[in-house]
From Swiss-Prot:
Lineage: Viruses, Riboviria, Pararnavirae, Artverviricota, Revtraviricetes
Annotated region described as Disordered, given as residue ranges: 76-116
Species of provenance: Soybean chlorotic mottle virus
Biased composition (Low complexity): 85-99
Record-given protein name: Uncharacterized protein 1b
The organism's place on the tree of life at top rank: Viruses
Amino acid sequence: MPGDNWTNSIIFRIKTLKDQIIEWSKNPTEENEYFSEKYLEKINTLTKTLDWCEKSNKSEVELRWLNQALSLPHQVPPPRYSYIRSESSRNNLRNSARNQPQNLVSEQDSDSNREN
C-alpha cells in the first residue's frame, strides 16, 4: 500500500493519545477530564481513518492530507466557567472569592513606602 508510512503515523498518534489519557487519569482534574474526552473523540476519528486507509488503496498525497486534517487538538483549555456545572458550585466559588483576604497593595503605595 502506498500510504504505509501514513498509516504507521496514524497508529503512532493513536498510541500517543492513549498514553496521554492514561497519564491524565493518574491525576483526575476537570481540565484533564475535558481533554481526555476530546482525545477519545480524536482516537475514534483516527481509528475510522485507519480502517478507511486499510480498506482502500489511496494515494500518498490523499493520506498526507488526511494526516494533516486529523492533527491533534490545540492544547487550549476552555474558559474556567465551563467547568462549573451547577449553580451551587458557582455560588460556592463566588463566596470563597469574596472571603479571600484583600492584601493587594497598589504600585503607588509601595513606591511611596520605599521613598519614606
